[in-house]
Amino acid sequence: MCTSTATPPVWLSRKYPEVLLKSEDGTVQDHGARQHASFASPVYRKLAYRMIEELARHYGKDSRIIGWQLDNEPTVQFDYNQAAEEAFREFLK
């Protein structure tokens, strides 16, 4: 079983635009590309954890589930959205 944490659903991208990656030139990635969410976003992390918890509650005892992938093809992307910049500034202190 997999979660959609690598590519959040379109409703999440539209309702919470602050979860989207932002490039150095200020371009915000939109839904339609893979891995467009910012792991630095507290909103994204909260919603991802909630989704994982709900799936675990629903499928946790299902004997047909033999494995669970929480993310798919994690990658490193440069991220300049507000949450990433704030976290980096805090790290530098």
Label every model-predicted segment:
Residues 1-93:
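Active-site mouth of glycoside hydrolases
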